[in-house]
Amino acid sequence: EIHERLVGSEMCIRDRFTLVLGFISALLPTGFSPYIIPIPAYTILISIFTTPRNAFFASTIVLAIIAIGMHWNIEVVVSFMLLNTVVMTAVSKLKFSKRSDLLIVSSKISLAGLLIVGGIYFLEKYMMDIDNLLIFKDLGCIVVNCFVISGVLLLGILPIIENLFRIMTPYGLAELADHNQDLLKRLMQEAPGTFNHSLTVSHLCENAAEAIGANPVLARVGAMYHDIGKLLRPMFFVENQSFYGIENPHKACTPRFSKMLITAHPKDGIELAKDAHLPQVINNFILQHHGTSLVSYFYNEALKEEGAENVNEEQFRYPGPKPNMKETAILMLADAVESAVRAAKNPSNEEIDAIINK
């Protein structure tokens, strides 16, 4: 359901941007330079909200429709097609680490636009007489289009689009991954073992997401926050006990009480996330990363103490829900693997492979 809602939001955004681009094209005064139509900005926006590949195909279709409707010359169509290829290549290499990177990309696209449009006019000058004023006007329009509209203006309206559609862009996600964010800073200071675990898991999730075509930025950022619920009782989680210099406090607890403390951290994390106004898509990682898995250690301890006839396995499971997105499913696997490998004493590569396969 969550995945369908996200896909629906992305399609809604794409359709609305397409309508806006169509209106701009229709309202353009006769005789005005076609190079001012913000097709590069459209391609960048769709790339940010979906993928560069999807954006390239969507913008190519839109370009063809506009070109036919406005009776563009072939050189204008070729210019925009070449420019779209540059945009797709530039955005696909973007790491989305900070919003200002968009200005760097738009600068490169502006230079490419100048070279493409200028190169086509240079070739045409050998075949026909072209007014130099027209050339300079079109070159100016392509620079305004690629840098001012696709860079400066886009940078300003992205946060508005994020709030309006309640969907996270890679830039918004990258900002959440900043270790100076309050919850991450608290995790680093109050539960350093959990913070290091989250950092390791986030890298695993990012690599796995890239490998299967999921959203690597979302997977990495969601993994950074998945265990924030441990902030309420950090000493009850083994990775933090050496930092606090204490013995395992679970030795003084019954298996049922320990299970209650352990399985509470997703729910505790949601409360912290709501207080911090984290987006719902990040909350999904917090709530779903254990699914309905069994807390096997304390279940087995309860079997020893109480006997099998007095212990219900369902009472020792996380309440769920199970992951319902690729990225949260990746986190569930990565979290379990990292914890199991960390618990093993100096495992060999073969032993690590066996843990992963198990």
Locations of the language-model features?
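Alpha-helical membrane-embedded segments
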Residues: 113-116, 137-163
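Interfacial aromatic-anchored transmembrane helix boundaries in multi-pass membrane proteins
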Residues: 31, 63-90
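Generic transmembrane alpha-helix motif of multi-pass integral membrane proteins
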Residues: 39-55, 63-66, 86-91
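Single conserved hydrophobic/aromatic residue that forms the stacking wall/gate
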Residues: 1-8, 13
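Hydrophobic transmembrane alpha-helices
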Residues: 63-71, 105-130
